[in-house]
Regions:
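Solvent-exposed loop and beta-edge segments used for protein-protein assembly and interaction
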Residues: 77-79, 134
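A short acidic (Asp/Glu
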Residues: 94-99, 151
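Non-heme Fe(II)/2-oxoglutarate
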Residues: 81-84
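Short acidic, S/G/P-rich loop/turn micro-motifs used as interaction or catalytic elements
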Residues: 53, 90-94, 145-148
Length: 152
C-alpha cells in the first residue's frame, strides 16, 4: 500500500489487516469510543508504513500532511477522522522502552514540520502538551499488541 486509504479499501485489499483492526476496535478491552465511532462511520483511514526501512519519517510525515489536506478539502461537516499508521513494532515491549520509542518517533516526525518547531521529551511530558504537524493538532495513540495495556 503506497498511500493512506479508507478502511473500506483495507477491507477489499487487505482483509487480514482489516480483521485485526476490527477485532481490536470492537473488543470490550478497547475503551476508545472515538476510534470505534470512526471505524463504524467509515471515517477511519490507514497508512501501512510497516515496509518502510528504518522509519522513513519523511514519507510518514508526507502521508500525514496529505491526509490532513484531504480531510480539510472534503470534510465539510466537521466530522472527526482517524488515521491509523501501521509501523513495524519495536523489538522490545517493556513499558519504559515503548515510552522512549514513542517519544523518539514523535520527536523525529516533528523534525519535518513546516513550522520548524521542535519538541523534546520534557515537552511531551507536560500536562498541556499538544502534538502538531504544520499547525494541525494530532492525538497520537500507540497500539502495541504485545504491551500489557491495550491502548498504550
Amino acid at each position: 500500500m503506497k498511500d493512506f486509504c479508507n478502511i473500506s479499501e483495507i477491507y477489499k485489499n487487505n482483509i487480514e489487516l482489516f480483521k485485526d483492526l476490527e477485532s481490536l476496535l470492537t473488543s470490550k478491552k478497547f475503551p476508545c469510543l472515538f476510534a470505534m465511532n470512526s471505524f463504524h462511520k467509515n471515517h477511519m483511514y490507514v497508512y501501512d508504513a510497516s515496509s518502510l526501512e528504518e522509519r522513513e519519517y519523511s514519507k510518514i510525515y508526507n502521508q500525514l500532511s496529505n491526509f490532513s489536506k484531504y480531510i480539510k478539502k472534503y470534510n465539510k461537516e466537521k466530522n472527526f477522522y482517524t488515521i491509523i499508521l501501521v509501523i513495524k513494532g519495536p523489538q522490545e515491549t517493556s513499558p519504559e522502552f515503548l515510552k522512549d520509542f514513542i517519544f523518539s518517533f514523535l520527536i523525529k516526525l516533528k523534525e519535518y514540520d513546516s513550522t520548524n518547531e521542535t519538541i523534546t521529551k520534557n515537552d511531551i511530558l507536560k500536562n498541556n502538551f499538544q502534538f502538531s504537524l504544520d499547525s494541525d493538532i494530532w492525538f497520537p495513540v500507540l497500539l502495541c499488541p504485545e504491551h500489557i495495556s491495550t491502548i498504550r
